[in-house]
């Protein structure tokens, strides 16, 4: 009889311990698994005093992961602008900068070279990593 009680108590203690460990884990829906897309930005050319979309538009539904861009020209890096579609128009969410990165939230985005202030054309190529 003592052996049955010991086994029952031991089994109950083990199950209670396991139940406590299971409830201490975060729920699966609280994890943030953002799919990322990466690739090359096709080589191209932006004429003098022109602006050109060089990547996008692309849609992000998971807004907690960073966007990363790297754009190079013949003589080094090229400043680019990240824009987001807001109220039916494109709004710049970064200033013209080299290799913009950041958590911009969810939405629809594009990457632009603004060459409107220059009298020389720019050639470019690049790469990206963006959340989906």
Please provide the spans of the model-predicted regions.
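Noncatalytic modules at the cell exterior or secretory-pathway interfaces
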Residues: 103-119
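Hydrophobic beta-strand segments within beta-rich accessory/binding domains
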Residues: 55-74, 111-113
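N-terminal prepro-regions of secreted/extracellular proteins
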Residues: 1-42, 46-47
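Beta-sandwich interaction modules
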Residues: 93-105
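Edge beta-strands of jelly-roll/beta-sandwich modules across compartments, strongly enriched
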Residues: 118-131
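Tight coil/turn sites that cap or link beta-strands
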Residues: 49-50, 58, 107
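Short, surface-exposed beta-strand/strand-loop-strand elements in extracellular ectodomains
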Residues: 75-88
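Beta-strand-rich interaction surfaces with strong enrichment in secreted/lumenal proteins
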Residues: 42-44, 55-58, 99-102
């Amino acid at each position: 009889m003592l052996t049955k009680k010991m086994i029952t108590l031991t089994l109950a203690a083990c199950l209670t311990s396991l139940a406590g460990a299971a409830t201490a884990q975060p729920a699966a829906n609280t994890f943030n698994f953002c799919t990322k897309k990466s690739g090359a930005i096709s080589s191209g050319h932006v004429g003098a005093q022109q602006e050109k979309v060089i990547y996008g538009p692309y849609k992000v539904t998971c807004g907690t992961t960073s966007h990363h861009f790297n754009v190079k020209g013949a003589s080094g890096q090229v400043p680019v602008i990240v824009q987001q579609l807001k109220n039916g128009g494109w709004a710049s969410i970064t200033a013209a900068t080299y290799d913009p990165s950041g958590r911009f939230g969810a939405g629809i985005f594009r990457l632009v070279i603004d060459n409107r202030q220059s009298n020389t054309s720019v050639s470019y190529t690049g790469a990206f990593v963006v959340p989906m």
